């Protein structure tokens, strides 16, 4: 029912009284608000300070992440302030908690610069996270409207084109990170790359913190790595690649390194999340213009994504990175050494791979999301995985993933090439069993043992790592599940 002119006038006069009034009364709380298709939606987990009403805390989050300050300002009247105010429109208690609330907040699309992750995040995760009225605050999910998505280029290459370039279909990509990640000379580094690729991997990669240190400058690494790639291609007849980490102190230096990688014939470059949103978008634009695959290492994300009550959920980073234009992003393994609840990981992968997301509360997906034809991002599973887990990896993660066995390749007792061969044989045996309709999850260990009868490197790997697991309960688990999930 619409308000009368008198009622609207009364509210307006009350709202613009001088001084400090509650955010909820300033217009940042509207339980009757009708969400528009063009609104940017955000879901925050709000933990109010003791004595602070959850509705007021949610309204404060809406206000401080949009147009509000601590007191009424008359200059609001010079703007379309009723339109530009973010509106908290629903507040729900978080299941199984006594002091946490889900705040649903809508933002008008005109509050954000087109095609700018930096501007979007300056509002959504800006000053509001230091606001005293909340004890803790976490951004759990967002819905990005199609009208805003269309201002971003999306992944530079995308999964489908990458498969065509690599000529790899019907199975996950196989890769490995060079180990040790720091300290090798350029020549030894190149040898590791060659052995891994010749043994059967599709990719080798730099790790997040190998840039241009005194023990090996970047140009030396690039030259030896590409020599290794070319020799491995000649030896195997397969398309291969090495992720060249072009992360550097300045954009000018990153451009120089990326251009050199291109001149050497590399099909892929790599950057780290820590370079920042603007730099990531800038390199994604460069990658698309230069027909390069862009790999993103999520270095630094757990400083703000791992804890359940403060920071932001990694699924939000997945959405921002798909908008920014990366082709790969590390997104968890479930069974490896890094944080990863099975349901949460599935939600991350779906966010990166699906063209349309439905609400799925067990996976932590709170909003329907149409991806507006933005290309798919290939998830990367890396960190503490080995060939003995191949049936679990294929079951949890599916085909569209890069499985990276760093220590699980280079730590093989018979050498790097043997480690790579063990992983390739294990993967192909498991994919074949799946394609034949076998219950490859239940039969997985036996499938691997059978494959190892004709592959000595696989048998050695299974003997070495058969008992290695990382069974820790995840800190970030779903709020809407019947039973707890374990990292097994």
UniProtKB/Swiss-Prot annotation:
Gene3D superfamilies documented for this protein: Ribulose bisphosphate carboxylase, large subunit, C-terminal domain, RuBisCO large subunit, N-terminal domain
Principal location class: plastid
UniProt xrefs under Pfam families: RuBisCO_large, RuBisCO_large_N
CDD domains: RuBisCO_large_I
Residue positions of the active site: 179 (proton acceptor), 297 (proton acceptor)
Keywords tagged on the record: Calvin cycle, Carbon dioxide fixation, Chloroplast, Lyase, Magnesium, Metal-binding, Monooxygenase, Oxidoreductase, Photorespiration, Photosynthesis, Plastid
Signal sequence coordinates: none
Site residues (Transition state stabilizer), renumbered to this chain: 337
Disulfide pattern: none
One GO BP: reductive pentose-phosphate cycle
PROSITE patterns, per the entry: RUBISCO_LARGE (PS00157)
SUPFAM superfamilies: RuBisCo, C-terminal domain, RuBisCO, large subunit, small (N-terminal) domain
Residues binding substrate: 127, 177, 181, 298, 330, 382
Cofactor(s) listed: Mg(2+)
Reactions accelerated catalytically: 2 (2R)-3-phosphoglycerate + 2 H(+) = D-ribulose 1,5-bisphosphate + CO2 + H2O; D-ribulose 1,5-bisphosphate + O2 = 2-phosphoglycolate + (2R)-3-phosphoglycerate + 2 H(+)
Sequence positions bearing N6-carboxylysine: 205
Chain's role: RuBisCO catalyzes two reactions: the carboxylation of D-ribulose 1,5-bisphosphate, the primary event in carbon dioxide fixation, as well as the oxidative fragmentation of the pentose substrate in the photorespiration process. Both reactions occur simultaneously and in competition at the same active site.
Note: The basic functional RuBisCO is composed of a large chain homodimer in a 'head-to-tail' conformation. In form I RuBisCO this homodimer is arranged in a barrel-like tetramer with the small subunits forming a tetrameric 'cap' on each end of the 'barrel'.
Assembly information from the UniProt record: Heterohexadecamer of 8 large chains and 8 small chains.
Protein name as annotated: Ribulose bisphosphate carboxylase large chain
Source organism: Gracilaria tenuistipitata var. liui (Red alga)
């Amino acid at each position: 029912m619409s308000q009368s002119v008198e009622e609207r006038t009364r509210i307006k006069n009350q709202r613009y009284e001088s001084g400090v009034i509650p955010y909820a009364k300033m217009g940042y709380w509207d339980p009757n608000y009708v969400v528009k298709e063009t609104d940017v939606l955000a879901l925050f987990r709000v933990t109010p300070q003791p004595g602070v009403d959850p509705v007021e805390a949610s309204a404060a989050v809406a206000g401080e992440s949009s147009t509000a300050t601590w007191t009424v300002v008359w200059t609001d009247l010079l703007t379309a302030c009723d339109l530009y105010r973010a509106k908290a429109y629903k507040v729900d208690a978080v299941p199984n908690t006594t002091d946490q609330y889900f705040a649903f907040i809508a933002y008008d699309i005109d509050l954000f610069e087109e095609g700018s992750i930096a501007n979007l995040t300056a509002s959504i995760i800006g000053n509001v996270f230091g606001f005293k009225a909340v004890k803790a605050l976490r951004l759990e999910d967002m819905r990005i409207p199609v009208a805003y998505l269309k201002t971003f280029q999306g992944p530079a290459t995308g999964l489908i084109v990458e498969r065509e370039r690599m000529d790899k279909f019907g199975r996950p990509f196989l890769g490995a990170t060079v180990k040790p990640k720091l300290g090798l000379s350029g020549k030894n580094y190149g040898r590791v790359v060659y052995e891994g690729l010749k043994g059967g991997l599709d990719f080798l990669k730099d790790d997040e913190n190998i840039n241009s240190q005194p023990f090996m400058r970047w140009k030396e690494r690039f030259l030896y790595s590409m020599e290794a790639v070319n020799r491995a291609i000649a030896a195997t007849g397969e398309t291969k690649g090495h992720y060249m980490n072009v992360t550097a102190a300045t954009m000018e230096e990153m451009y120089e390194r990326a251009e050199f990688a291109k001149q050497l014939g590399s099909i892929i470059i790599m950057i780290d999340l820590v370079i920042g949103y603007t730099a990531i978008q800038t390199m994604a634009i460069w990658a698309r213009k230069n027909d390069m695959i862009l790999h993103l290492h999520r270095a630094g994300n757990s400083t703000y994504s791992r804890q359940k009550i403060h920071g932001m959920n990694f699924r939000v980073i997945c959405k921002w990175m798909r908008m920014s234009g990366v082709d790969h992003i590390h997104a968890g393994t479930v069974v490896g050494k890094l944080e990863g609840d099975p349901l949460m990981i599935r939600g991350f992968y779906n966010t990166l791979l699906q063209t349309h997301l439905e609400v799925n509360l067990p996976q932590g997906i709170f909003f329907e999301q149409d991806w507006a034809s933005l290309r798919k991002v290939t998830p990367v599973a890396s960190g503490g995985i080995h060939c003995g887990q191949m049936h679990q990896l294929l079951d949890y993660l599916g085909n569209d993933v890069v499985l990276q066995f760093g220590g699980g390749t280079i730590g093989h007792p018979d050498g790097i090439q043997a480690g790579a061969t063990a992983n390739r044989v294990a993967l192909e045996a498991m994919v074949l069993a799946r394609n034949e309709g076998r219950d490859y999850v239940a039969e997985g260990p036996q499938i691997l043992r059978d494959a190892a009868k004709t592959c000595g490197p696989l048998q050695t790997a299974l003997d070495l790592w058969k008992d290695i697991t990382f069974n820790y309960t995840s800190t970030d688990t779903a709020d809407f599940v019947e039973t707890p999930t374990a990292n097994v």
